[in-house]
A protein has these predicted regions:
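N-terminal intrinsically disordered, cationic/polar leader segments
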Residues: 1-228
């Protein structure tokens, strides 16, 4: 029996990375989950049991920690570019993909003001960054997930298919709540030093939320479609 090895990738998922800076009485917290995936010349490991070119997933985890130890001051997209480019530099790697989820924390409010060293998990969704590096080429996508939104009007659902098992009444004005995951791609400028990922992400999320709030929606599906440009 003959067979052909198709496209494949492997990597390390759910690398938990929490970094606290205690430079003074006010502490800063970063909380990331990192996934690394590699594609390339790894066929021998699959068909011949030869691991000579395999980069251990433990190495991936430790590399993320080492790079974060050097510098984790910037946005997740910038850190993802560093990690992806590091692994893309291996000769056997064709494409290195890195996905980062940044979990937001805000300072707990106290009678004396924001706590310098106590935090509350944020409710504004999880920031996403997905980077792919192949040789000198890079692509950068960003986004947000688990962004829970609700509006108390400007939503309807009428004129839908009905049959003997349909019990849902039509509604010309209703509550609408949903959990949003949205992603967008940046142009080539995102791969160059100095691109302001934080500002770009803030603008995209601001526009997404404004569209949800302002759009008079005949359905959840229609709310997904209006242009955000």
């Amino acid at each position: 029996m003959t067979y052909e090895l198709g496209e494949n990738r492997y990597g390390k998922s759910r690398i938990r990375l929490v970094k606290v800076r205690r430079d003074g009485p006010t502490h800063d917290l970063r909380d990331l989950t990192v996934d690394v995936a590699l594609e390339g010349d790894f066929a021998a490991a699959h068909v011949a049991g030869d691991n000579a070119k395999v980069i251990a997933t433990d190495t991936m985890k430790n590399t993320v920690y080492a790079l974060a130890s050097d510098d984790l001051a910037g946005p997740p997209e910038a850190f993802g570019l560093r990690v992806a480019r590091h692994f893309a530099a291996y000769p056997q790697v064709r494409t290195a993909s890195v996905t980062i989820r940044e979990h937001g924390w805000s300072r707990i409010a106290t009678p004396a003001g924001p706590a310098p060293d106590a935090f509350l998990r944020g409710g504004s969704g999880t920031r996403l960054a997905t980077i792919a590096a192949s040789g000198d080429a890079t692509t950068v996508e960003a986004g947000v997930e688990d962004l829970t939104v609700l509006k108390t009007t400007k939503s309807a659902f009428v004129g839908f298919e009905r049959d003997a098992l349909t019990t849902l009444p039509e509604a010309t004005d209703r509550l609408m709540a949903t959990k949003v995951t949205a992603t967008w791609a940046y142009g080539p400028a995102a791969g160059r030093t100095g691109f302001d990922f934080d500002a770009a992400h803030a603008r995209a999320v601001e526009r997404l939320l404004a569209t949800f709030a302002e759009h008079v929606s005949p359905s959840v599906q229609a709310s997904i479609s209006p242009s955000m440009t």
